[in-house]
Amino acid sequence: MATRRILKELKELQRDPPVSCSAGPTGEDMFHWQATIMGPNESPYSGGVFLVNIHFPPDYPFKPPKVVFRTKVFHPNINSNGNICLDILKDQWSPALTISKVLLSICSLLTDPNPDDPLVPEIAHIYKTDKTKYEAMARSWTQKYALF
């Protein structure tokens, strides 16, 4: 079941890729993908290229994929290990969701962080109290870690 669904999503992604994202298997293993997310223009991540690993569980799509940033990013919902705090990757997951929708949700999270459900409280505090400083730090990290 999982392999068929993953192949279907891969074909859809190749036919109709989401804006500023791409994804596909890293090798022969269909359960391990790498994705590329371009930093959204209207965000401090603009110009950055962010690499993301995607690991599908054997019971996909009934369980969410594990999605982890490989590129360091200064963000209240993404920690230093690359883990992402995003509801659809946890309790709000639905088998109706696809990797394409997950990637678009991550792009949206880059544009609009959720400081009320942070993975990194210190960054959430900066975001809430000094947005200019937050944006400068996010831009700085993007230039340091996400430019190719």
Curated annotation (Swiss-Prot):
Alphabetical list of Pfam families matching this protein: UQ_con
UniProt domain UBC core: residue ranges: 1-147
First-tier enzyme category under EC: transferase
Domain of life: Eukaryota
Pathway connected to this protein: Protein modification; protein ubiquitination
Single GO molecular function: ATP binding
Keyword terms: ATP-binding, Nucleotide-binding, Transferase, Ubl conjugation pathway
Entry EC number(s): 2.3.2.23
Keyword Transferase among record annotations: yes
SUPFAM superfamilies: UBC-like
Active site feature: 85
Biological process (GO), any one: protein ubiquitination
Keyword set includes ATP-binding: yes
Catalytically driven reaction(s): S-ubiquitinyl-[E1 ubiquitin-activating enzyme]-L-cysteine + [E2 ubiquitin-conjugating enzyme]-L-cysteine = [E1 ubiquitin-activating enzyme]-L-cysteine + S-ubiquitinyl-[E2 ubiquitin-conjugating enzyme]-L-cysteine
Listed PANTHER family: UBIQUITIN-CONJUGATING ENZYME E2
Function: Accepts the ubiquitin from the E1 complex and catalyzes its covalent attachment to other proteins.
Stated family: Belongs to the ubiquitin-conjugating enzyme family.
Full protein name: Ubiquitin-conjugating enzyme E2 29
Organism: Arabidopsis thaliana (Mouse-ear cress)
